[in-house]
Amino acid sequence: MIRAALVLICFAGAAMASEDIPDKYPQSVLYNKPVEVIPHVFTAIGATAPPTYENAGHNNNLSFIVTGDGVIVVNSGASYRLAEALHAEIRAVTDQPVRIVVNENGQGHAMLGNNYWIGQGVPVLGHVDAAAEFEKSAGQSLASLQNYARENAEGTVPMGPTETFTDRHVIEMGGVTVEVLYLGPAHSPGDTQVWIPEWSMMIAGDIAFHERMLPLFDNTCTSCWIETWDTAFAPLNPTWIIPGHGHPTSLAQVTRYTRDYLLDLREKIAVHLDEGGDLTGAYYVDQSRWSHLDTFDELATRNAGMVFAEMEFE
């Protein structure tokens, strides 16, 4: 535990914004080399930036758990090549085979690498809602990947998970109990968390953001996200959190940059609505408190418009 605490202290001290760093691991298609967060749990930290040619779409966290009888991977990555590169890093750490891949949601950067793992004979698990979302959006996600990643998109063929779950799927492997959870509505349909109670480690997926501004989608319910956080996610009280985006950190930090941001934006939009404000004015509500976050310039006004549309008829 002392080692893990030191790791997180190092992350906190070195967690400079990576939005302006095109690539931290140029010898690999991965943006970052995987690091061991606590013993047996590794993550390759993605760029806190939009997907680009330089980061090859590795802008989320790709994690893996090494047990005594195999490896559990969380996220297949945004492409065949990213999945292949992560597998090479896993092989450098352990001789244990990959037994299962868990997709954290139905977005391209979680599922577009599935065909690599399926080709390796590895089962891929995803939430039923995430699988349905990917089925609808896979073509657009692939086209986007091909546009920005160019040759790094080669080999990628959209494939959904081979197995689905609804609320909870327990993996017993090598003396470790891993709970794959759907705690409730959050960032996108089927957002999934991977919880290791014995180690108090949460691989949170996109329910939790750190260091970058979270994006809101047309199907994001911010009030639901806050409720899921307060009633299901926070009560688990994990010591260690690997968020969907950003460096591993604490519950307090992801609460600040996820739940507290959502509450603050909803409060600002509520005041704007009470004063008779319209959509155009909503784009200019004061979000300066969050201006230090990566992707603020790309997302702040868009998020304000999304919350206005959500709250206008609440």
Task: Enumerate the predicted regions with their spans.
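N-terminal signal peptide c-region/cleavage motif recognized by signal peptidases
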Residues: 12-14
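Active-site neighborhood of phospho(di)ester-bond hydrolases with catalytic His/Asp-centered motifs
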Residues: 74-76, 99-106, 125-128, 183, ...
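Divalent-metal (often Zn2+) His-rich catalytic cores of metallo-beta-lactamase-fold enzymes
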Residues: 195, 223-281
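Active-site HxH/HxHxD metal-binding segment of metal-dependent hydrolases
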Residues: 88-163, 167-170, 189
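Core dinuclear metal-dependent hydrolase active-site scaffold
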Residues: 164-197
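C-terminal regulatory/interaction regions
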Residues: 28, 274-314
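Conserved beta-strand hairpin/beta-sheet module of binuclear metal-dependent hydrolase folds
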Residues: 38-89, 194-196, 200-205
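Sec-dependent signal peptide recognition
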Residues: 1-8
